[in-house]
């Protein structure tokens, strides 16, 4: 996307981003946080207004409060029109492991052992 932006094929000036996930207990300035990753690899390289970029607050000790805040934020933006995401090694989305029932609202999950092992390389 940054290459498209550099070529003038993509404009970020009027969009809002709502990140899918963040690690709990890691602040936005930590190099392992998704917030930091997005700043380094996208937000700082395109013409997006930083006040239009949203990532869950991994440092909010009250996870229920943070989930409610994020749901209100999404609703206030009119919902999510397009979601760009990756799939985990076992098909998980946003650390939600494959299951028969999928929780739609913002929530916190515990990582499976396989997911922890797969992501361990980012914390070495």
For every predicted segment, state its role.
Residues 1-7:
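Glycine-rich N-terminal segment of FAD-binding domains in flavoprotein oxidoreductases
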Residues 7-14:
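Active-site cofactor/substrate anionic-group-binding motifs, chiefly glycine-
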Residues 14-21:
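Short internal beta-strands
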Residues 26-124:
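Conserved phosphate- and dinucleotide-binding cores of soluble alpha/beta proteins
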